[in-house]
Amino acid sequence: MSVATSGISDSVLGVSTAIHAWEASASGSLTADELKNWVSERIAAHESAIAALLAVEGVRTPENSLRLYDIALEQLNLAGAQAGVLNSVAADKEVRDQAQDEAQRIAQAGTALSLNREVYGALSAIDLSAASDATRHFVERTLLSYRLAGVDKDDATRAHLNQLHEKATLLSLQFSRNIQEGAKTIVVHNADQLDGLPADYLARHTPNCDGHFVLSTDQPDMQPVMTFAKSDDLRERMFLAYNTRAYPANQQILMDLLATRQEIATLLGFSSWANLATADQMMGSAANVRSFIARLEEASRTGAEREYGMVLEYARKQQPGLKVMNAASRGYWYEQYRREAFAFDSQSVRPYFPYAQVEQGVLDTAAKLFGVHFKRSSAPGWHEDVSVFDVLDIDGETLVGRFYLDMHPRDGKDKWFSATPVVTGVRGRYLPEAGLICNFPRPEMNEAGVVTDAGLMQYNDVVTYFHEFGHLMHAILGGQTEWAGLSGFATEGDFIEVPSQMLEEFFRDVALLQSFARHFETGEVLPAELIQKMKLAGAFGRADWVRSQLYYTTLSLDLHDQDPTGIDLDKVTKSLYESLQPWQWIEGNRMYASFGHLMGYSSNYYTYAFDKVIALDFFAQFDPANLLGCAAATKYRKAVIEQGGSRPGRQMVRDFLGRDEEFSAFSDWLNEEFAAAGTRA
């Protein structure tokens, strides 16, 4: 799916014809050495483009200089994206290990580029007098990133920064790998402890030869236990197993990483890593993040106290003498309360959400919203589990991208839910490709082709699918830009969760849900009455959800907004939790060791809550009677999604809304359950 442009092709750059690392194998099964060679070709192409950039004579223009820089960036992005994918999904551990090594090597090349004074000088000299706004934005943002990297420091300081970034990358990769491969199991000796779990869950978990049941901390095993299991003991065991799956390995790694990041920030003249990490974001500074946190705290405090009080009152009726509810009881007691207050049992909708129908529903929704078509492709993926789809524009013929769905758990695979670039799109050169790496329940068939397990999903799973697909469409439709450096996800980091959280909101529409939510056995459409109960029950607990986001947001900021020397991670996480959460802390909880967002987002986990405010304001502009076909849908694609990173996030907000985001839509969403009258059973 590559197209040569500007007289520069992959062959000229000296790379193989395989744009995908998993196709660079003579045998059809990628080896560690073949991956290493594939990455080496891409790094060599990157270096060739930089050499050509520095050799340009005369007046520097976007086409003779920025184009070469962008191609160099494109080659690093390509190598980095696919090394990252294989690090997360490769079935062969040797390939995963090699992918991690390659990710480190690619990061080193990126750091060297960011500290290259000659390149900075060349980019600074580009004549932008006739350049487009997007080109100006690209150059200005790139030059800022160079200054924030320390390109203006002396040779010794830049060498030290290079070493520190190399160390930080290695620590981050190892932290993530420990989470990925850190799954634990718990053994259930008594079947009575499984009471409350769905029938299809029990059917998948038959006793072993000793008569015991073995459960894992993978999402399809863990989430139902935390939501439905009546046994306090089982929930607490699962909670602790899940929150210690990368402990103690990641404890010291995190401490070392915090110290390394702080040293980088200090060398660059910042008081903390948080101030460095927010300097080129929409938020701008750690102080602005704290102001936002304070506003969220005030907005959610009363609602969260009310929600907890109502659930606790109900729980005490079920368990007389109960004083407090602990962290392992949160999902369970919310589920029980919703059954009582709203006559809604979340198990009741699971039969309407078999995986295959949900997938089709998400595809159909996105196709209508964005005016595209999806066509299953025979192109190879990185594993036999992967489904591949081509994206066609509104005419049904023009190919605009491709995506890969790797949606179910397997050994060695990353345990979370994420969207990832695969090929960075550049207009006229590469069509964009992206992938989803998820862990939804796997449908099963017997040898006769009869479905034995439909892979029933909880409604929160369906919301997650919509969320990740929002990222995917951002990568594809935003990947038609002139420059790789502005393609797809290349917005400010604290704008990136807007498209994902926007698409979540479409799950609340009755007509949209009924278009795909059908009972896996009878074909019955999900009743409107049940949808209404689901929506009302789902609205209850939003303030509590915001408090959870506040906890993660404040923790990520606090860890990076001070000198980490002497930080006691156990004390910090517990103390902060108890200041924000009414649910009793469980001793032995080491959640920080598996808080993977500390790697990619570092101090900036606030992105989720900040972008929720923007996304809800965006969604409020859509016509509820015609969500997928209203004028706002077309405007959203044009003004936001298709832009990729071609405009600053602040400008995209103003282009779509005609103003800055406001808090009112978020406040309405937050208080929706309490604002509605006569909604309880």
Each predicted region: which residue ranges?
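N-terminal helix-rich structural modules
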Residues: 2-197
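C-terminal, non-catalytic "cap/extension" segments appended to globular domains
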Residues: 3-31, 37, 41, 212, ...
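Short His/Asp/Glu-rich catalytic/ion-coordination signatures at enzyme active sites or charged loops
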Residues: 19-34, 83-102, 124-163, 216-251, ...
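Short, hydrophobic/amphipathic alpha-helical patches that form generic packing surfaces
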Residues: 74-85, 140, 144, 240, ...
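Active-site-proximal, well-structured secondary-structure segments within enzyme catalytic domains
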Residues: 134, 138-139, 177, 183-216, ...
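Charge-rich, well-structured scaffold segments of protease-associated domains
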Residues: 149, 156-170, 354-361, 607-610, ...
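Short, hydrophobic/aliphatic alpha-helical segments
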Residues: 251-262, 433-438, 480, 643-645
